[in-house]
Amino acid sequence: MSAPDSLEGKLLIAMPGMGDPRFEHSVVFMCAHSEEGALGLIVNKPAPELRFAALIEQLGFDVGDPKREIRIHFGGPVEHGRGFVLHSSDYRSEGSTLEVDDSYSMTATMDVLEQIARGDGPSSALLALGYSGWGPGQLEAEILQNGWLTCDAAPEIVFGENDETKWSAALRTLGIDPLMLSGTAGRA
């Protein structure tokens, strides 16, 4: 169970002018957040050169043509050779699935990929290569410096097909028009 002020299961929305081009217009689903740090997956930066069917073949799964295709995303700048499947909580791999909340889970083992390729597994999923990580207090400091906004996660944003509109859709959940945002911030 997460602490009351935990961002687990929430979305981070990158603010214009945050200063890190790797996160420009990013929407990050927060999988873990505690005093020790935070881990999230960018859900709106696809890796169009990578195809799920080719990955399944490369991994040597004997499933024929995959029964299902999921999109592959750039999850963040840390360990970008490692895969993480963010998915609906209707799937669980014993001992290897992190239940983020009642709606979302994350699995980082090969079995979930094989299940998806066979047409089984979670009803909604995306594969992220790499993750976004923060040390103790680092994310909180970035939020205080107006680098990020936070909002509740919605499946239609997290698992939605149109990656180009996820950033503006997340902002709209807060009642913010993306065209009205400034790249600079201040305090009165």
Predicted features, each with a name:
Residues 1-128, 132-188:
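A short aromatic-anchored loop/beta-hairpin motif
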